[in-house]
Amino acid sequence: LLDVLFLKSVLFCHEVRMICSPYFLRDALSLPYLNEQNTMNRMKHLICVFLLAAFGSCSFKANAYTERDMLQKAADETTLKNVLVMKQAWVPYPAYTDRAAWDSLMGPNKQRLIAAGEKLLDYKWQLIPATAYLEYERTGNRKIMEVPYDANRQALNTLMLAELAEGKGRFIDQLLNGAYMSCEMNSWVLSAHLPRQSSKRSLPDFREQIIDLGSGGYGALMAWVHYFFRKPFDKINPVVSLQMRKAIKERILDPYMNDDDMWWMAFNWQPGEIINNWNPWCNSNALQCFLLMENNKDRLAKAVYRSMKSVDKFINFVKSDGACEEGTSYWGHAAGKLYDYLQILSDGTGGKISLLNEPMIRRMGEYMSRSYVGNGWVVNFADASAQGGGDPLLIYRFGKAVNSNEMMHFAAYLLNGRKPYATMGNDAFRSLQSLLCCNDLAKETPKHDMPDVTWYPETEFCYMKNKNGMFVAAKGGFNNESHNHNDVGTFSLYVNTIPVILDA
């Protein structure tokens, strides 16, 4: 115990610079006497190894923001304009009326989605009163606003999937109700993010629209509902579709093009500031809205290229080694949302503008499989949860897009023999994308096969395992990383997937 406490104090006293050759550490972990039964000796040996790591003669300075500008190098605005696929011809899903195609795509998901929709036929769309928004500035409680907000959004997404699955019009009235109610809201922004308005208050100000994680996702969902059901809506009353277009334009399209000060776009980024998962997350949602709603080629090209310049800021900020400094819990929103954005961009340009073959993007994807210890445990640096593993359907389609067998096998491994079913929740894009890969994932070989050593020199993460069931994760870094809470020089030790020492 004293040895462990000493190691902890050493690791925290200075920014740890990991030894340049982690393979030395791997070899050290494999020394013959590790097969002895004396667990204490093994642990002491391991601690000595990490002291060597901490005081290694060769240090590695973490790279700062790097002007890669990968997307802008892939195409300028003129090239982009020439390759844009217009009038939603890029959408990879059948038309709502093509029932045979939907039956084929839905497969075993069909009855499950219809049953979920049937539970919402009598759903009462929830009003969010002014006091629910104000509660955030009064007490800091954001849930009182977010719970009914998210219930409405999930209901709208589920009803969309149910109607696409069945195609008989049973869910159209409820979809109409949900879309109409959504348009009647003053804002789709979460109360906790509304203080970014000029008023600095948590009550929506109808005179100003900003884009956050909530409004972007809500706008994308509304854009998909409009795309699939505009014609049946118009048969009932065309005012609803008109109102949807107006709401999406005013809340997403216009502020996206006219406001350079939204921090997550990073157009005014300064050294020392953080660019985190908000960037690809919000940009992926905005890109869906533009590709689904904007049919003027000049305006669309300007919007898409603006998104490319913004996402380049995120790619420039993250480390090229592929690690997610925000931790495994945020991987789906950081690297995962970057993948979503790149997939949408590739689809919207007929595959002409794509970074999915870039090694850096693949490394960002494989970070999740490398960070999985086993039996539900993951390396939880920063404020990530210690248990998880990620969304198998997201991991699979990411892996397939970047040609990573490791990720595809890992996705099947996470299912643990269960059948893959379409994702529901509130994310329309991921729900729809999950339909495209369920059948292939069901046939994939389940395997979690990672190297003995994974070394992230820029982010300063190192993972090591050996044949005796030991898995060690160590972190250098510094405490101005996104979602980091003084995780400077920390480590975790797992034996047979069970956490033994967690330096929390």
Model-inferred region functions:
Residues 201-327, 340, 439-444:
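Active-site lining segments of carbohydrate-active enzymes
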Residues 90, 140-152, 164, 199-215, ...:
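Solvent-exposed loop and edge beta-strand segments that line ligand/cofactor-binding
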Residues 335-502:
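Carbohydrate-active enzyme catalytic cores, enriched for enzymes
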Residues 117-128, 175-193, 240-266, 302-322, ...:
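Long, well-ordered core segments of solenoidal/helical folds
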Residues 151-161, 210-227, 275-291, 331-343, ...:
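Well-ordered alpha-helical segments within folded domains of soluble proteins
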Residues 65-137:
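Low-complexity, Ser/Thr/Pro/Gly-enriched N-terminal "stalk/linker" regions
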Residues 1-2, 11-14, 18-66:
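Bacterial Sec-dependent N-terminal signal peptides
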